Regions:
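Structural detector of well-ordered beta-strand residues that form the stable sheet scaffold
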Residues: 56, 79, 100, 153-154, ...
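N-terminal "arm"/small-domain region of PLP-dependent enzymes with the aminotransferase-like
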Residues: 1-32, 350
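Phosphate-binding glycine-rich loop
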Residues: 31, 35-77, 83, 91-94, ...
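Short beta-strand-to-turn element immediately C-terminal to the catalytic PLP-Schiff-base lysine
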Residues: 179-180, 193-199, 238
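PLP-dependent aminotransferase-like
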Residues: 70-148, 152-157, 164
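Glycine-/small-residue-rich active-site loops that bind phosphorylated ligands and cofactors
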Residues: 84, 107-108, 134, 185, ...
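Conserved active-site segment immediately N-terminal to the catalytic lysine
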Residues: 155-189, 204, 216-221
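PLP-dependent aminotransferase class I/II
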Residues: 37-45, 49-53, 114, 118, ...
Length: 369
């Protein structure tokens, strides 16, 4: 274990001198929070970069999920995926709704739209799909189902910063989309997130809800929360936006090296780029068929850790196996065969903009040997 540690990710950091200059501006203005100039600039810059009409910044990636459900007044049951980070389902639970798990597709690890209709009941009010690993789900098919049954669609797009299909941002699908700007993501604001919406009226409502419900100095129009982004994180985000394209390009090169080396290794499967999709290379999951590969996922995972190579088993275990949710009828493994199998096969390899050729070679040697 003497070799230097290779982590699964590494945060994109702005130039420290440039950041210090922006901090001086904040100190001089004494406007630290409450939608200051850098907050406004970042919202505008993100709208332009992401090709979306309206965006509202949040202090993390979970609060946009909670707020979207509140803003759309979602009740009853929400159809979602068990193969995600727990915040997806927790946001449903915290809003007093019942999550209903639907199995996933093997080719994207996203919710399988062919299985959604069977999960709809008179209590269903919304669908919350996830663009897992930044791979777009079948949005048109999901929207057709939502339109047929009068359901809202909220996309958890935490992994999908900058992802486009045929030149159109995936964030424009559904009723709203949420983003995470956590330090582990392709683009980060230290901690942060955002909610994307389609019209000015909804933008105003979201901005009220994230500011205690205030619509003016003395008027409260809704029971809101406090999830405003401060000027320090907004400044940090503005600087990171200038370098995110280069970071994604670096990630793409790593993905290409992984694919070239692993393509013909028995028992290892991975995703190729999807036609017409602009990917962000946020993750590089591989799936281990133990019989063909000669060892289990966990054997490889712990062997890598012993050599200071820290992959992650995203997403194991399934959300549906946690104590809060395992009693739900939809949480049964028999209802989720694809998700259950993939959760036991997956390892996300190290993937970030700072990986060197030597790092990648070291990782690949551990897998190929």
């Amino acid at each position: 274990m003497s070799q230097e540690r290779i982590t699964v990710t590494s945060p994109l950091l702005p130039n420290l001198d440039e950041f210090n200059e922006m901090l001086k501006e904040i100190w001089a203005s004494k406007w630290i929070t409450n939608m200051g100039q850098f907050h406004k600039q970042l919202e505008q810059a993100l709208c332009e970069y992401l090709k979306v009409p309206y965006i509202s910044l949040f202090t993390n990636g979970t609060l946009p999920l909670l707020t979207a459900l509140q803003a759309l007044r979602i009740t009853g049951e929400v159809i979602t995926t068990p193969y995600s980070f727990v915040a997806t389902t927790h946001s449903i639970w915290w809003n007093g709704c019942r999550p209903v798990f639907v199995d996933i597709e093997e080719e994207t690890c996203g919710i399988d739209p062919d299985k959604i209709e069977a999960a709809i009941t008179p209590k269903t009010t919304a669908i919350m799909p996830v663009h897992c690993y930044g791979k777009p789900v079948k949005m048109q098919q999901i929207q057709a189902i939502a339109d047929k049954y009068g359901l809202k669609v909220i996309y958890d797009a935490a992994h999908a910063f900058g992802v486009e299909v045929d030149g159109e941002s995936v964030l424009n699908a559904g009723d709203m989309s949420t983003l995470s700007f956590h330090a582990t993501k392709v683009y980060n604001t230290l901690e942060g997130g955002a909610l994307v919406m389609h019209d000015e009226q909804t933008k105003k409502r979201i901005d009220y809800l994230k500011n205690f419900g205030f619509a003016g100095e003395t008027e409260v129009v809704a029971p809101g929360i406090n999830s405003k982004v401060d000027e320090v994180r907004a400044a940090y985000g503005l600087l990171n936006l200038k370098q995110v394209d280069q970071a994604i390009a670096n990630r793409q090169k790593v993905a290409q090296k992984y694919r070239e080396a692993l393509r013909n290794i028995p028992g290892i499967r991975f995703f190729d780029d999807m036609p017409g999709v602009r990917h962000n290379y946020s993750y590089f999951p591989i799936f281990i068929n133990a019989e063909e590969y000669g060892k289990t996922r966990d054997q490889l995972y712990f062997e890598m850790r012993e050599q200071n190579v820290l992959g992650r088993r995203y997403f194991y275990p399934l959300i549906s196996t946690f104590s809060t949710y395992r009693g739900l009828p939809s949480a049964s493994p028999a209802n989720l065969p694809v998700a259950t199998r993939l959760a036991n096969e997956v390892i996300c390899l190290p993937m970030h903009h700072e990986l060197t050729n030597e790092d990648v070679e070291r990782i690949l040697k551990l897998i190929i040997k």
